[in-house]
Amino acid sequence: MLRKKFENTKIILASGSPRRQEFFKNLDLDFEVRLKEIEEIFPKTLQSLEITDYLAKLKASAFDGDLLQNELLVTSDTLVWLQNEALGKPKDYDDAFAMLQKLSNQTHEVITSVCFKTKNKTEIINDITQVTFGKLSDEAIKYYLDNYKPFDKAGSYGIQEWIGLIGITNIHGSYTNVVGLPTEKVYLYLLNHTF
């Protein structure tokens, strides 16, 4: 349904995430991937949703002056929020192990902000999903890290992977948001806005 609406607009997805690219493909969108390296650093005073909003906008600002009139840029950022602490992508194996130990037997929030930028305007949408892990043994965490290497994922896990299948006991909200993009909200935004 969106293909016709965007036949004269070039959608640019600024994400190296294979999961986000697959979602865009499955939404039947014609898009191009363009990447720019930015340092994902945020002011320590920011909390929760403020962090992902800030980082999604920061990623979009890297394209200031580069967009043509008929181009729509999409950037996003996802993080795990647990007890007033942001868990982004792990620095290394030990950091990933520690994150999963913290998530064990706890409910956390997965927060994603998506920024839509054209030559003339920037808008942002976001989503929050609550996810509960049961008790994860150190042996299960080690097995997961050794075999799935989730070092490119916020919170050091993929809900669609082994650890999600054996460890997640409850989810309240958007499943696709936990994977990395709230597709339902993205689709409705694209459907209902003019670019």
Swiss-Prot record:
Reaction(s) catalyzed by this protein?
dTTP + H2O = dTMP + diphosphate + H(+); UTP + H2O = UMP + diphosphate + H(+)
InterPro entries of this UniProt entry? ITPase-like_fam, Maf-like
Q: Name what cofactor the protein needs.
A: a divalent metal cation
* E.C. no: 3.6.1.9
Q: Name one GO cellular component term.
A: cytoplasm
The record's Pfam families line, in alphabetical order, gives:
Maf
The molecular function terms in GO held by this entry are: dTTP diphosphatase activity; UTP diphosphatase activity
Q: Where in the cell is it found?
A: Cytoplasm
Q: Which GO terms describe its biological process?
A: nucleotide metabolic process
> What keywords is this UniProt entry annotated with?
Cytoplasm, Hydrolase, Nucleotide metabolism
Positions bearing the site annotation: Important for substrate specificity: 19, 78, 160
Q: Which residues catalyse the reaction? A: 77 (proton acceptor)
Report the family membership.
Answer: Belongs to the Maf family. YhdE subfamily.
Q: What is this protein called?
A: dTTP/UTP pyrophosphatase
